[in-house]
């Protein structure tokens, strides 16, 4: 057996804390809390009653309130509304921790990743969605030039799950390009030539690929950063992603990768493009990570519960300052 990865070890620690928090016996937790109580809470009931009566006879109202808070048990405290919200704060924090743990475990268990050399036009099955590398384009900036991958992420319909194999939509889809302000020349292999002049595949004056407008057989897309959501009559839902690999003029050996990310409430899709050639294919990585959104929600809820509990503690000790 090999060593555990850092993520698996982290999940194990989170599970241990989860069991320690929720599955310990009630008596054990009650005894632990009793050891941390203030010393004046262990007074005899008769002695506590005498202290309360004597404190009420004093004229200093602030001191009487503080003494009442210190003398009475927590379930009888009526000074301020924040003291009754302590169980609610605890539930928010523990609920956030549970959601965070669930997001970490499910995202690791349901993760789907493909890394390898892919020829143009090949189709990948990523769970219920399909991914196709439609083409490779070139982009030129002021200090760099880059190769830009053109990925299609779609969900096939239930009636025709193998849509590309049974009709002629795949060749048309692979060769389709944005038309507004575009001047594209293809050589039959599904990629455009080097952009020149004011009009090219990237739109007027070298506009970024993710901001390009619609396809000949589609309606106006919903444009977002790094990907474009489109509509198609044969697909239930599909979008395009444009990862880049940039090479800088100052140092040709230095290259950076721009990841295309698509995020929703349930799944995050990541697409990366590497080196390759049109004859052998291009190295690409497509990652599907579900339930990442729940990690953020759990972290926010746990932080909110901790802040509310801290505010309650500060309000509690403020009575002594007055």
UniProtKB/Swiss-Prot annotation:
Coiled coil ranges: none
PANTHER family in the record: CYTOCHROME C BIOGENESIS CCMF C-TERMINAL-LIKE MITOCHONDRIAL PROTEIN-RELATED
Organism: Marchantia polymorpha
Keyword Mitochondrion: yes
Compositional bias (Polar residues): 184-195
Chain spans, region Disordered: 174-207
GO biological-process terms attached to the record: cytochrome complex assembly
GO CC annotation: mitochondrion
Alphabetical keyword list: Mitochondrion
InterPro entries to which the protein is assigned, alphabetical: CcmF_C (IPR032523), CCMFC (IPR044955)
Stated name of the protein: Uncharacterized mitochondrial protein ymf2
Broad class of the protein's primary localization: mitochondrion
Localization: Mitochondrion
């Amino acid at each position: 057996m090999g060593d555990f990865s850092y993520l698996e070890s982290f999940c194990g620690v989170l599970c241990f804390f989860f069991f320690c928090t929720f599955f310990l016996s009630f008596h054990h937790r009650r005894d632990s809390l009793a050891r941390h109580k203030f010393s004046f809470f262990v007074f005899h009931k008769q002695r506590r009653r005498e202290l309360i009566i004597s404190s009420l006879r004093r004229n200093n109202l602030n001191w009487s309130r503080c003494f009442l808070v210190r003398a009475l048990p927590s379930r009888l405290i009526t000074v301020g509304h924040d003291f009754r919200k302590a169980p609610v704060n605890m539930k928010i924090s523990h609920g956030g921790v549970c959601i965070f743990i669930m997001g970490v475990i499910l995202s690791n268990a349901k993760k789907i990743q493909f890394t390898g050399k892919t020829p143009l036009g090949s189709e990948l099955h990523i769970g219920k969605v399909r991914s196709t590398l439609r083409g490779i384009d070139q982009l030129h900036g002021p200090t760099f030039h880059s190769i830009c991958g053109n990925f299609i992420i779609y969900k096939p319909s239930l009636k025709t799950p193998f849509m590309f194999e049974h009709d002629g939509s795949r060749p048309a889809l692979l060769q389709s390009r944005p038309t507004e302000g575009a001047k594209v020349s293809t050589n039959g292999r599904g990629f455009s030539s080097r952009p020149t002049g004011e009009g090219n595949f990237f739109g007027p004056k070298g506009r970024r690929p993710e901001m390009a407008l619609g396809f000949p057989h589609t309606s106006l897309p919903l444009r977002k950063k790094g990907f474009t959501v489109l509509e198609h009559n044969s697909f239930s839902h599909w979008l395009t992603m444009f990862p880049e690999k940039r090479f800088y003029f100052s140092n040709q050996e230095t290259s950076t990768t721009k990841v295309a990310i698509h995020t929703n409430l349930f799944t995050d899709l990541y697409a990366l493009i590497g080196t390759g050639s049109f004859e052998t294919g291009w190295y690409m990585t497509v990652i599907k990570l579900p339930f990442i959104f729940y990690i953020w929600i759990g972290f926010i809820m746990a932080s909110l519960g901790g802040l509310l509990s801290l505010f309650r503690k500060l309000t509690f000790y403020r009575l002594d300052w007055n």
